[in-house]
Amino acid sequence: MIHEKSKLLKNLETAESLKLSPLPYHTSRLLELSDVSIAYGSRAVCSNISFTIEQGDRIALQGKNGSGKSSILKLICGENIPYQGILRKSERLKISYVPQSTAGLNGFLSEYIERNLLDESLFKAILRKFDFPREQFEKRLDEFSEGQKKKVLLAKSLCEQAHLYIWDEPLNYIDVLSRMQIENLLLEYKPTILFVEHDSAFCENIATKTVEL
């Protein structure tokens, strides 16, 4: 066990560190939810949720399965989620979103890059830092493992300059070394981020604030 940990730390030392370019915003408050409730038909998902996001916050959104965590993230990102209450978003707020599901990934990586207007060199460089073999770039996305698909979504977000990063279970299917790279990245660049993650150690290390649903 000690040998494995020592090997992992050595690998982390040799692994290239990830980079991020969070954008500053001209006011400290980016977003506010006041008494927000979400229901799908007669099924209530969450009720009377209130919190604010200030610049520099790293907020862990926590709650049981089915408590509305993903719905809150999607609502903030502008998806058509039925809700009551008040959601105030700062004007021209740029958000970078990593969804929980990888289901939408299809076609070739080159098509994904073009579709999302990504810098190809930067995007592929990030994937290489995530230990992607070069031959993987030529395969279809639906041939990727779940961990590789999640890395594609994370690499896209790391390419994007944003005021607010919203990540839904970013560590799902991710190997231990990449988890450590992601943790180091967030502690170094300190982006404003709202995230859902079941890894309690990650939440404890990263979050400056916790919101319970």
Language model features with spans:
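ABC-family P-loop ATPase nucleotide-binding domains
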Residues: 100-156, 160-163, 169-172
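Coupling and communication elements adjacent to P-loop NTPase active sites across diverse families
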Residues: 1-44, 54
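Conserved hydrophobic segment flanking the Walker A/P-loop of ABC-type ATPase nucleotide-binding domains
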Residues: 51-54, 61
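Conserved H-loop
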Residues: 191-196
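ABC-family nucleotide-binding domains
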Residues: 65, 168, 174-175, 179
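ABC ATPase nucleotide-binding domain signature region
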Residues: 58, 64, 71-123, 197, ...
